[in-house]
Amino acid sequence: MLCQNSTCTMDTNEDAGRFVVTGTDAHLVRVDDYALVRVTGKDAVTFLHGQFTNAIQGLGDTVRSAGYCTPKGRLLATMRLWMDGDAVMMLVPKAIGPAFIKRLRMYVLRADVKFECATDGVVMLGVTGNAEAVLADLHMPVPAEGAVVRHEGLTILDAEVAQTIAGFTTGGRRALIVAPADHALVADAGDGAYWWASEVAAGKVTIWPRTRELFVPQAVNFELTGGVVFNKGCYPGQEVVSRVQHIGETSRRASIGLVAGDAPLPGAPIFSDGAEVGFVVEAVQKDGKSLILFSSLRAALLGKLTLTPEGAEVDVLPLPYKITSTK
């Protein structure tokens, strides 16, 4: 599918969200799994504000995560958003981009809103950890928490802090860089699978084709990583998401795990004592081990978790943030 007024296409790989590290350790990597979408028109901000789980009005010089839900409160897409002049920029996985944009367009009606694929001519780079030192070595500014900075033709986005997981990521502050495709940084960038390992290590959910409509935001800790605000007014699924929040507890939460063997696909089941208790959100494989983000019944974390009823045990790791009551 083509974005409006553009010649670029998006990948529709249904198995996206499972990654295998093939390159050497790298702190600056090329991330080709994202599509960049520019949204313009006098009604663009108002329209998007009424569609997503986070506030789009008042973005200013910040970058925010947001989700797009079904009327039943299930996540269809996740994204990062920031302003570029009067345009709203959306960073979404290529694999969900076509269905996501198609669905958004259904609700534009008479509003002045246009979607344009802005991926041509740019490359997304990820700083997978220790961003202060990495960016300083590159003579680039470090964005403040949640901020966007621009430097010599680059757009640098702050990203959530990740924890250290030996062999996968060094942890610490992270960043995303929108760079011209011919920029010198691009040639030296490493394996993009390390970016997705850092996303798992940050406890940061991305919705992939196999996990569309599986999770309410709280089941993947989305409100704990800045993806939901509860005072912005209506959006699709808002009543369900708010109801879960005001109950005070949710029976499902996201966790990080390490397990021997090949990386599972997103949406693959998680088992406890032979019973299905959750689903894989994302997975990265390296050297015979897989780092996974998964959502499961909270009570199941007290027992043995596996990827198959008789499979290897998942070693549950700490999250880089606290699980709090939803109330």
What are the residue ranges of the model-derived segments?
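Acidic, proline/glycine-enriched N-terminal capping motif
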Residues: L2-T78, M83
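Acidic, low-complexity central loop/insert segments
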Residues: D25-R30, A35-L36, R80-A202
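Short, surface-exposed ligand-recognition loops at beta-strand->loop->(often short) alpha-helix junctions
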Residues: R38-A44, V127-N130, L258-L265
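Short, intrinsically disordered, mixed-charge
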Residues: H49-Q57, P98, K102-R110, M140-P141, ...
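Glycine-centered loop/turn motifs
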Residues: D61-R64, P141-L157, A263-A268, K304
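Short, conserved active-site entrance elements at the starts or edges of catalytic domains
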Residues: D191-G192, A197-E223
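Glycine-rich, small/acidic residue-mixed loop/short-helix segments
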Residues: V220-G227, S242-K327
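Structural motif
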Residues: Q238-E239
